[in-house]
Amino acid sequence: PGEHAELAYFKANGFEIEKRAQVLGTLTRAHKGLCVAGTHGKTTTSSMAAHILHQSHVDCNAFLGGITKNYGTNYILSPKSDYVVIEADEFDRSFHWLTPYASVITATDPDHLDIYGTKEAYLESFRKYTSLIRPGGFLVLHEGLEMQPDVQEGVTTYSYSRGHGDFHAENIRIGDGEIYFDLISPLGHIKDVQLGVPVSINIENGIAAMALAQISGVTPEEIKRGMASFRGVDRRFDFRLKDDKAVFLTDYAHHPAEIRQSVISIRELYRGKKIAAIFQPHLYTRTRDFYKEFAESLSLLDEVILTDIYPARETPI
């Protein structure tokens, strides 16, 4: 807030003040930015990519949107690596400050309509973001996005999804609490990839993270080791209790599409089990704009407890 004592001090004493997004933009101009944008999946995918790179010979810096369980922090610093992994946030058009070397776009389901107003404006913002990727860089798009990219000359564009695209999975094996699959990639196939956090939604997240790792020169064995040793992110499909009687997890699924994917992943993992959820809507405007979609997604559950809306930055409407 503008009246914050420390902020007021720096303003009064003539210090240059920049938003976090501006600082991240400076980092992407000084280093090779590996950025993950999209309505959902950003935090897990960028955290996966950061872990794969950090434990490899390539290494990386990283500025993430959640606390990674491998490191207990949302940032990683490396004095030797020229790569920086960044979670590219579309809220307030923050990702327009970035100049990525390579970027994944996970999804473009409309969100933040309090900022954008319309679905068309939201998609146009992502289109502009793709134009910021530097020449000679890379764009990895999820299959089936409505948004059409506008990349500069010399940018290589790939597609990905669980079962289709330039990067995809084959020979998926789910059982006994583990998930294995083969990565099919234009940069070299990798067999028997193991998910460190074995939920099916992480197959796609992992494919995107491995694409960035391959683009950055991480070896196949380093990629497999990083995927298997990734421990997840706080509040992203985060198991808090798991025994013979019950499983309890917390997940920051605050968009209807995210809720749907989370429920599908849980049902695939625990077939035939009852699923009950406590759901706290996030933001008045998001709840207003997508109440029908929320109702449809929550209907996939067996039992739902609704709490009051969490306002975050908003006042009641």
Please give the residue ranges for each predicted region:
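Beta-strand->loop->alpha-helix junctions that form or flank phosphate-binding loops
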Residues: 18-25, 63-65, 143, 154-175, ...
